[in-house]
């Protein structure tokens, strides 16, 4: 993430966004090894859901009301679940090893937990 702006009140400064960004970079790395014929199928789907996770976190940061922020963060939480589902399919198709699946799944489980903590902090 070198070179990204880090001005005050910028979504790039949110730990939850940074963690999601790091997870997304791992997804890009792993999907680069998927078969070419999956480019418009599971590769595209997992990249879209992983990208949407951090995009929704960023979008929520720009929302004015807490209820609206939380609503968008719930969408991000759904995208995390979708990403984990795609990882399970990739494992089933043997596009990733069990170890790689466990690592990535754990990263996204932790991201989901952290997102829940962030959502709860906004509710107070």
Where do the PLM segments sit?
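Amphipathic alpha-helical assembly/interaction segments
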Residues: 1-124
